Amino acid sequence: VDLFHDCVKDLSEKIAKMMGINSRIKRMDSLMIEANIRNLSRIELLYSCVARAVKYHHGNHTGIDLSGLEHYTDPDDQNLVIYHSRNIDVDVRTATIINDAEILLDRCQGQYGHVKEHQLLLRCLEEQTVIDDNGKRRLRIKGEESPKPTSLQNPTDPEATFSAKAGKKHIGYAANIVEAVSDGGSVIVDYQYEQNIYSDSR
């Protein structure tokens, strides 16, 4: 139940009545709502998901073996891996992170599927990687195997989606609004959010 939506709708109807606006005459419009999140590169996204899962086990003392993965709990580790290791090819660093993800999941043996951090890690791997003919997991090739617009953009806001409009990239949501209109003015009487996944071509 969205209590905020119910409250806004109720107040809007009362305002429309007070202004003498005929609620039977309505018009609809849509707008894009930008999510308050960073636009992550693929290596940043994968790192963030692995780090969150490792930190979950470290912070909750689950007993999962984190040997070799301890560095993900260091607050400075992300900057070191992502920004201060440019002498190491980004594909090599990304492959290492993917391998770390598989190591962690293998050690967990499917026991933590109910944990949000694990759900996001599994989703990220499914959307950003594929298993090659040799049985090895690798990053999807841009263009040929690009993730869908509905893919995870940032683990801090899992529902935010991607679209390209007017030559610009947007990460967030689409809002559909219903406006009651009359000679005395107008007021928004209802709204809803949906995934912002359609480009200009759609």
Question: What are the language-model segments listed below?
Answer:
Residues 1-202:
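Polybasic low-complexity intrinsically disordered regions
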